[in-house]
Amino acid sequence: MEDASLKSFLEKVGYRVVDRTLSREYEVARLIAETQGCGPPLLARIEGVRQPVAVNVVDTREKLYKALGVTGDSEAYAKIVDSTMRPGRLEYVDKPPLDEMPEGFEGLPAARFYEGEAGLYLSSGIVIACYEGVCNASIHRLLILGRERAAIRIVPRHLWHLYRKARERGEDLPATVVVGLHPAVLLAAATSPPLGVFELGLAAGMLGGSMKVYRSPVHGNPVPLGAAMVADVWITGEQVEEGPYVDALLTYDRVRRQPVVRLEAAYIKEGEYTHTIMGGSLEHVNLMGFPREASIWEAVRRALPRVRAVRLTPASGGWLHAVIAVEKQHEGDGKTAIMAAFAAHPSLKHVVVVDSDVDVDDPMQVEWAIATRFQADKDLVIIPRARGSTLDPSAADGLTAKMGLDATKPLDAGMGYERGRIPGFKWGSRRCHQPGD
């Protein structure tokens, strides 16, 4: 691929321009909340940000398909899994012309999205870091503290590993924050491949097998060509209180002591579009959950070859609850799918397995399957005090009770398990059809 520009992607799929400048204080949030899931991506001006800012770039599954160049879930999952196993090639090129951004962190498209949040948050930045030969790219929220200071939320995964390695040697971790990229790069940065598998290689695989990158001006970290904003930073040993922040579940994540990021230099690439994401928005949920759906799909498929659909539900932040549709071959397949899903995505809390005649995107059909095909004394799986998600406020100690519901019908099920059929009508379709429509 020539570059990983967000602008080139938006020009390909189409977008709509918002004809006013938005305040960082809640106006950006209202625009996202009012328009998400409806229509094309939007391009707006935000006060204090030099470049046009895109929102709702991949707030629907259809937009994710376009970002990956596929037409449906299975093809998308296969591309993500294949890119993880066989990453693409990074082609190093000369650094493009970049303009210094004297506003520093204050020039990033950060905003205050919810009442009670700690300040202006940026949730669309990819943090790229290389240390002792291991490179990582992942998405982390930044709380803007001033022109040269921000707080970063780091969970104990791969960036945390690199950060701890640096701190054990008394060093700050050199990193690069990149904003405004093709959504496939964001999707790759939201995956969790094994430590040492560089997420930019996954992005290259998703974008056709190769991706052009250049070295950041100060630290020399790889940056995808076409990035709108680039900031070389140090993740320091200093810590400050970070939060509250409204996360994927639309609840206020608790306040923690988190590292301070110190700015070394910030740059913009003229003519590009940058990007902001609201915590808990459909775009946030899609980017977080879709790679985990691919992991669940692959894990369950290895155990049961006929997996028809996987869905991490939007109401659970695309994170805690899964619905999986399968075609059973043997009794017990439902429980096998439950255990495979929990192993593939340790943050899962509840899993419902249904037959392939149930639409996983229709909560009424899923509840119907539970009502008609589930018995708690034989179809329920409970795993007490297992590792949970820090996003779940009811799992304060990091442990949770996991529950799986096998809502599949018996293999010898008779007509009593079938839903009534009306020729020419599909359950879940539009309810308010009028004669003549």
From Swiss-Prot:
Keyword 4Fe-4S: no
Active-site residues, Swiss-Prot/TrEMBL: 247 (proton acceptor)
Pathway recorded for this protein: Isoprenoid biosynthesis; isopentenyl diphosphate biosynthesis via mevalonate pathway
Entries under InterPro entries matching the protein: UbiD, UbiD-like_C, UbiD-like_N, UbiD_Rift_dom
Needed co-factor(s): prenylated FMN; Mn(2+)
E.C. number: 4.1.1.126
Highest taxon, organism lineage: Archaea
Protein name: Anhydromevalonate phosphate decarboxylase
Species, as recorded: Aeropyrum pernix (strain ATCC 700893 / DSM 11879 / JCM 9820 / NBRC 100138 / K1)
Lineage, highest ranks first: Archaea, Thermoproteota, Thermoprotei, Desulfurococcales, Desulfurococcaceae
